[in-house]
Amino acid sequence: MSVLEKTSDMSLSVRSADPLRGILLKVISVFFFVAMATMLKATQTIPSGEMVFFRSFFALLPVLLYLGWKGRLRHAFATKRPLGHVLRGLVGVASMSLGFFALTRLPLPEATAINYATPLLIVIFSALLLGERVHYFRWTAVVIGLVGVIVILWPRLTIFAGGAALGEAEAVGALAALMAAVLSAFAMMAVRNLVHTERTETIVTYFFISASILSLLTLPLGWVWPTPEQAALLIGAGFFGGVGQLLMTSSYRYADMSVIAPFEYVSLILTIIIGFVIFADVPTLPMLAGAVIIVASGIAVILRERWLGLDRARAKEASTP
């Protein structure tokens, strides 16, 4: 999983039109996910595999409590595709591990901005691997967005920076963040495949369970015993991640994804502020410039999808006898 990437696509069909409520829930969920990332970054001496375990295992608590309250707990474990969940778990755990590792090497806003490449990469992989039709406008937006990623990464990559590099640790962190975004895109494509037969709560529950189990495979790589403060931060990160997941799910009940999705970029503002106040991270000009390019291209893709959806709806209405 990438740094702020949600563990699965929990979007639901809109049940009642209340865009303002949906937007509010989305923004609150962003606060929870940013808080989660902040807590994880504050435990920098903890191995990323160990972070994945705490983030996944303790996210189960609010999710299962919510499903029990709604009377949907029994549905969460009914699956027709167990191997599909395992595959999604493997890719998701790898993405999360790389993303959390990047958090320990990069400023918080920079790791967040690189993560924004995920939806752009989904467009590319969907076209190349699934044969989805992508028009000129979306390709242009994707290419521009990837230019933004390069703008952010360039100063970090020592092999290309010609002596002006900012350190080997940052270079490794930048590459880890990029690979996390790539794997996150594949994870989202796996989720897209699962939603044809699986309930939303099933996908989410099995991911947290599989991630908790798979992360234990990193034990031989050297987990450490956390201090009480670190343990509190790790447990808090998991709990906040689970609550953020529920809030994000609820937001899509009240408005279309095309309305809600742009507010994900509120996280950039939050991480810049938190990074400066808590971690003394001063945003660099390449990071800010690249982030603006990525956000602009991402919003362009979202709006384009919305316009196409409206056009398809009008065409359908016009053809209805």
Q: For each predicted feature, which ranges?
A:
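Membrane-interface interhelical linkers
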Residues: M1-I28, L60-L87, F160-L166, H196, ...
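Juxtamembrane helix-loop boundary signature in multi-pass membrane transporters
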Residues: M1-L25, V123-L178, V182, V295-P321
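Cytoplasmic-side transmembrane-helix entry/capping segments in multi-pass membrane proteins
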Residues: G22-K26, T79-G89, V134-V147, G173-A174, ...
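Hydrophobic/small/kink-forming positions within alpha-helical transmembrane segments
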Residues: V30-V34, L64, G89-S97, P119-I124, ...
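Specific transmembrane alpha-helical segments of multi-pass solute transporters/efflux pumps
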Residues: F32, G71-P109, N115, V151, ...
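Juxtamembrane helix-loop-helix junctions in multi-pass membrane proteins
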Residues: F32-A59, F186-S210
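C-terminal transmembrane-helix exit sites in multi-pass transporters
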Residues: G99, T118-V143, I269-L288
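Helix-helix packing/entry segments at the starts of transmembrane helices
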Residues: A111-A117, L194-S210, Q245-F276
